[in-house]
Structure formats: structure tokens, C-alpha cells
Amino acid sequence: MERFSDDDLRELLEALHDKYNRPEFIPDDPISVPYRYTGRADREIAGFLSATIAWGNRKAIVSSGHRMMRFMDDAPADFVRNASERELALLSSYAHRTFNGRDLRDFVLALRRMEERHGGIGNFFETRYGATHDMPAVLADFRREFFAAEHAPRCEKHLSSIEKGAACKRLCMYLRWMVRCDDRGVDFGMWRRIPMSALYLPLDLHVGKTGRALGLLTRRQDDWRAVEEITAALRRFDAEDPVRYDFSLFGAGIDGYLR
């Protein structure tokens, strides 16, 4: 593919953003799971768990996310805070690919501990970012805190480690949902103490291919260094809100810009 000029690339990114940052795409996206709810805590917890299982077929992800909420009596915040041992045991029959019922139980208990110690997952991120102004450091702190209590070691694979160089796609996507605030009605914009400029692009195999095709990424591996590179490239076009172009790169794949 011939490399785009900056002006042409800006025009393409803006057109795709305008086309795909729209509420009509919500039902087919994992963000539809937290959209079941109106309360902050419900949305934080449903969003985190939905993002956690967001790999593979999108239709299956969305279906599994909604099914997970039904396992939690469609009241995720109340379930995290108050579920009894008997209710936690009922999670054992849940599964989405390699994320099984035991993993879900350990994640629920970790979220409960986050609620008790920090006032919720959002308050943890906002407070830590306010203290450090360093999102990669906050991502590392969050993972350490999340797994600080007793848990099955196998569940650690479901929360990527930035300290091991992972792209942390699902966490970056979750942060986009919680932090970004615009007039489009897709992202929630609930965590106002974190600026949109602090976010990093959710990078997976498909976004990496699109970024390379558009000249936004040269690194071959889809790791954290690639996340930093492609986010820096997008900041050339919008330093205050670079991750809004996540919609553009998603749309570029749908519209066939890799062909």
C-alpha cells in the first residue's frame, strides 16, 4: 500500500472516526454489556469483566458478556459486594474460551477487595493517576493490587502485564470506555480525573496490521512498545484525545483499507 501523506491520513482518520464513533454500533460491541446499567459501579464492574473476555469472535464476546451478567443476577456491583459463598459457587459453570468459572470467582473477589480498599476500580485509577500522572505506572500498580490477595495463579493470564511488555489491549480499551468523553454517546466519560490525553490505543493483531498499512506503526511486534509508537503517531493528529482514532482504525479494517 502506498504511504499516505499526513494531510490525507488526517482526512481519512477523521472521516472514519465520524463514521464509526456512533451509538448504532454499540449493540455489536463489548461496550454493550456495561450499557445494560446506569449506575457508575455497575458500569465499572460490567465494563471491566466484559473487557477481560474481549478476545476472539466479537459476537461470541458480546454474548458471553451478557451471559456473565445474568450469572451475577444482572446486578454486578451488588453481586461483587455481597455474593455469598453459595452464590459464588454457582459461577463454576460459566466459561468463555479459557476464562472459566473459577477465574470469574477470583475476579469477583478481587473486585470486592478493590471496592473495600479503594472505593472501587475507578477510584483506584483516578487516585493513582492523580498521584503519578504516569498511565503505564498505574497499569502496573493496578495489576499488582488486583492480584494481591489469594487467587489461582492461572487467572493471572487474563490480565496482561505491562511490566512484561504486553500491549494490555483489553485494559486500554476499558480505560477508553471509562475515560473518553465526547458528544457521540459511545464512551462513558465517567472518570473525569484522568485526561483523555493520558490514554493509550488498544492494540491487537488487527489494529496493528491496520496501523502498519496506514504508516502509523513500524514495529513488527504487537507489544507495549508498539502501543507507545502508534499512540505517539496518533497524537500528531489530536494530542488531547488520540485514542478517539481507535474508531478509525477499527473502521479502516471494516472498510477494506488493508486490501
Predicted regions and their residues:
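HhH-family (HhH-GPD) DNA N-glycosylase catalytic core used in base-excision repair
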Residues: 1-259
